[in-house]
């Protein structure tokens, strides 16, 4: 049983995980307003996995520009730039710097962010990769507090926030709390057309693995594989 479970988990962990979940949102996503055509093209280029060097050059160029006079657009572009720097550069320091820039704009203009929970939890995710535990916990806690205070604004940021919270608890060996957080993330996902549900089931399988509950591990590992094929 343990060998089979280990094989399933190893297979799952070789796939794209929630650690890479913050791809640049599509230009026609859930936005409070429409992006200009040239900005849509910039987002496409920043997210071009087939031309990473050009994407990084563009990201570095945009990061060097002075802030936009439009807070909404500044946050949008900064998040996209940070995402590119995070995905395509080994050291997350540059991604952190640009995401912090987006957060600073949000602090001044709270209504300018379409998804504050995503903005905050993404930064926490970057801090986690850098090993900045205190800052990671601080911003993820803020993201969670925002979700709790705004249940009527349910969106993908809710899913990300509680998945990130689960990862933080897992890192600390607090698996019961990690299970509670990932279960909540799954609940939110199911309310959003099962958004990234395969990754969430994979994460839940990993927590059951740490708890040595192998039947449950197998169940959620298989669910993750099944949903990933849909």
What are these regions (language model features)?
Residues 39-40, 79-80, 121, 163, ...:
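TPR/TPR-like alpha-solenoid signature
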Residues 37, 76, 118, 156-160, ...:
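Residue register of alpha-helical TPR repeats
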Residues 50, 89-90, 131, 173, ...:
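Residue-level detector of the short coil/turn that links helix A to helix B
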Residues 20-83, 87-93, 97, 114-115:
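N-terminal leader/linker segments that initiate helical-solenoid repeat arrays
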Residues 60-64, 100-108, 141-149, 183-190, ...:
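Amphipathic alpha-helical segments of tetratricopeptide repeats
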Residues 1-42, 123, 216:
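Bacterial Sec-dependent N-terminal signal peptides
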Residues 44, 83-84, 118, 125, ...:
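Residue-level recognition of tetratricopeptide repeat
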